[in-house]
């Protein structure tokens, strides 16, 4: 058989094999087109599980008459126009294959009208060459797509359709997922003339939990823990069910969205599972509805024809970000609720001291009996989030640090307790082990401090470097190694390989685990402070540093790594500065007594005061 160009209909039917798997696939593609058109109301009519009829009606922007024929052509789209658009996709559709593929395996009719047109127009394709016919029609502003007799001309595909009930259940699940992605859109679903689902739009700032409960059920809503987590261009929002109360029915609720696009991503599922693993049994699964917002340039959605999968350019960063966000919410859930007056109070637990940088040490003062006020939880501030806790040699430090930081942001009203004995020393005696109180942030990377009436400036990047060095320096036990989701494989020279082998024991104490072969080294684990770094740059530089050394001391290597790590904060906030100083005072108390050069600089206000008095 000679090589020849396939007829348009046959080519579209081949493409339909990838895009149109079943009626639910058609519904997904058409509803996503409606959302891209800016629709705020979408009505979906299904007959016989979608095999007989699929009708999607929306109130979007519509399609111009001159573009109707192109809309049914293959590789025709208004979503992208250049490679730059493809590398930063913000729409749900972009391939321009859906309508052409669907029309090749069904009888598709497209009716649309724009606000500028006086009348609507209808288009349909037929014949071997998929010629498009356009004629006038009556229709309001928006678009209606009718798909009749799906797979009528491909009997083999039609045989694989399941029962009417099964196919409609798949459609219902797709609509549930879309309704969770777009709370601002009204969606109505009917089957065989009966309305089955009605999801009303939720106004901006409205009660999204109402739609969440309607879709996921009250059982999930009762156990749902809200997530609001942000770091740079990454934002994680949504809900995760309390793992301690997860049931097999709840475990079926696993909805994840990346930039509003529903996904089935193993990396995201792994991060969530890892965060919940201490609270889930071997046969249990977490339940969640999560929304990940990321810079479109950092994610590739052009992976699968049905757009079910994505690839992240910095997969380790995304994995750890999601893991830490879910873990922080679960740790907050472990906090003991405020007891009522008539309830027996549990024995006090050991809580690290509230550091002076956040204000006066109220925990060192006697409690005053006052009426119990309702607990107030401040709304999460946009553009900032609690700093991710670092581990250290002290067991359970992550939880303690998270608890202290949350207490700095939200202090419950004093409890009614018997009057405590007077403290043996002044309440602010902790000043001797503190840098002081953070007043404000100066030039985005310096903290203005006040201690005993004296003012000083502290360089936050320098303090961060000392903290990292302390975190990386092994104590009585080696630094805990964190396995990489995707090991890093690098090509090395003979000299570099020899240096790595000599430094292997020292690197192991720092939590860096690797395996070498003839010409390559594979980094399998790193300490937690390195997980947020660009290892493809840092590790080769570290190998180059080791190749120039003759003695390999863990302390020297930790110092070099700390000096070469990139700062997590381009601009520091008050909360981040307070958390950093709390960590430095805990792990590096010697810096408070004898600050090294470049860390702390006193500010002399006497000239300014004198100038004011002389005026």
UniProtKB/Swiss-Prot annotation:
Residues 378-391 have a biased composition (Low complexity). SUPFAM superfamilies: ATPase domain of HSP90 chaperone/DNA topoisomerase II/histidine kinase, DNA mismatch repair protein MutL, Ribosomal protein S5 domain 2-like. Keywords: DNA damage, DNA repair. InterPro entries: DNA_mismatch_repair_CS, DNA_mismatch_repair_MutL, DNA_mismatch_S5_2-like, HATPase_C_sf, MutL/Mlh/PMS, MutL/Mlh/Pms-like, MutL_C, MutL_C_dimsub. GO terms for biological process: mismatch repair. Coiled coil: none annotated. One of its GO terms (molecular function) is ATP-dependent DNA damage sensor activity. GO terms for cellular component: mismatch repair complex. Residues 369-397 are annotated as: Disordered. Belongs to the DNA mismatch repair MutL/HexB family. This protein is involved in the repair of mismatches in DNA. It is required for dam-dependent methyl-directed DNA mismatch repair. May act as a 'molecular matchmaker', a protein that promotes the formation of a stable complex between two or more DNA-binding proteins in an ATP-dependent manner without itself being part of a final effector complex. NCBIfam families: mutl, PRK00095.1-1. This is DNA mismatch repair protein MutL. It comes from Escherichia coli (strain SMS-3-5 / SECEC).
